[in-house]
Structure formats: C-alpha cells, structure tokens
C-alpha cells in the first residue's frame, strides 16, 4: 500500500528548495516520489494520504550516540518517583547497579525518545552488546563519527549546530530510503530559524524505513 505524507512545507535537504504544500510518497521502505502534493497525488491517485502540520524534513542524525545510550540511564516510567524522568549521568548513574539487561532496557527507552525527536540514526561507536542490540531492534541507523561533537549531549539534534547539519540524507530520489520527520513549527517565516527556535521536541511524526515509528498524540 502506497502512502503519501503531506505537510504545510517540505524541506528536501541538500540543494533542494523548500516546497510549500510538499509531500513524500512511500512504497514499502522506499520513497516513491517527492514534490508538491498535487503532483505526487496525481501520480499516485490510489495512495492513502496522511496530513501533518508544520515542516517535513529529512530524518535526523543525533551525534551523541554513545553519550546518550551508553553513558546515560533512561529511567523506566515505574522508577519515576525515585529517579525522575530525565536521563541520569555522572554520580547519579554511578550509584545505579547497571547490568547488561538494564543497559539494554535503558537504550530501548532512549532510542524511543530519539524517535520522538525525529532521529533516524545516531553517530559514534556503540560498544555495549546490549545497547547495540537495542538500537538494531528499534531500527536506528548507525553513522561513523570523525570528531567529538561540541556542546553538551542532547536528545535534540538541532541543538548547538546549523539545522541542515542534523539532516541525515536529502529526501529522494525515487528508490531512496524513506526516512523523514515532521515538526509542528510555524511556516510563515524562515523554516530553518523556526526549527532551531522550537527544537526537535516539536516532532509530530517520524518515518523510518517507511514505517511510522513515532506519532505524537
């Protein structure tokens, strides 16, 4: 079944110009078309249509893979009263008894939080087997990291760098992997400034390998 994802504005990445009322058609795990909604819908009249508010962009790469998944603990919701809801690092992490099973569960929760920020891949070497397994099961891609990222680790790939540097790969051409995200930010002005100002926490949908893996309710 082919699905068209349409948004108020599409930023294809790379050298592509913004497309007001843009859309991406997805067949299986691959992109079938990218462009104005009217053209994409005319080419695929039988497709199911999902409409999203805001800006549709390429999927994001978080540069802090090891820091967020192997050097931080993401508490289970059942531990919230004791540990809170935010990732634990430093002395708070050192005080925990961390088994392989606990690292794996933490990484799964961390990966889900990444998906909720439009992330489709992480950069940096992951060395814990339980963490690698969790990342693989969730479906996040893994990218090589050639230098240490600047600034504190963040779940927001837009934080501390130009928005376009967070994009993993430009959208398209036909046959490319269907990895993208949608952010509910204003589209009346500079969309890049809006993404930086409001951040990846505004993500309303993440598509990874053609699957809708996150949808904000």
Predicted regions and their residues:
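Active-site loop-helix segments enriched in His/Asp/Glu that coordinate
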Residues: 117-156
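Short, charged, surface-exposed secondary-structure boundary motifs
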Residues: 59, 151-158, 192-194, 216
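Long, charge-dense
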Residues: 79-83, 87, 97, 144-161
């Amino acid at each position: 079944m082919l699905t068209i994802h349409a948004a108020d504005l599409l930023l294809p990445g790379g050298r592509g110009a913004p497309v007001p009322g843009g859309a991406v058609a997805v067949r299986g795990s691959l992109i079938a078309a990218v462009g104005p909604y009217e053209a994409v819908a005319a080419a695929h009249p039988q497709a199911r249509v999902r409409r999203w508010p805001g800006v549709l962009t390429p999927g994001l790469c978080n540069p802090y893979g090891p820091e967020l998944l192997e050097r931080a603990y993401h508490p289970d919701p059942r531990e919230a009263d004791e540990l809170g809801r935010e990732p634990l690092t430093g002395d708070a992490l050192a005080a925990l008894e961390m088994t392989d099973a606990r690292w794996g569960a933490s990484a799964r929760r961390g990966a889900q939080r990444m998906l909720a920020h439009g992330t489709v891949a992480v950069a940096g070497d992951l060395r814990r087997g339980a963490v690698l397994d969790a990342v693989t099961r969730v479906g996040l891609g893994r990218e090589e990291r050639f230098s240490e990222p600047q600034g504190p680790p963040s779940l927001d790939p837009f934080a501390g760098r130009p928005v376009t540097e967070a994009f993993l790969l430009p959208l398209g051409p036909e046959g490319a992997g269907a990895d993208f995200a949608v952010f509910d930010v204003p589209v009346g002005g500079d969309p890049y400034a809006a993404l930086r100002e409001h951040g990846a926490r505004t993500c309303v949908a993440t598509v990874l390998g053609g699957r809708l893996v996150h949808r904000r309710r």
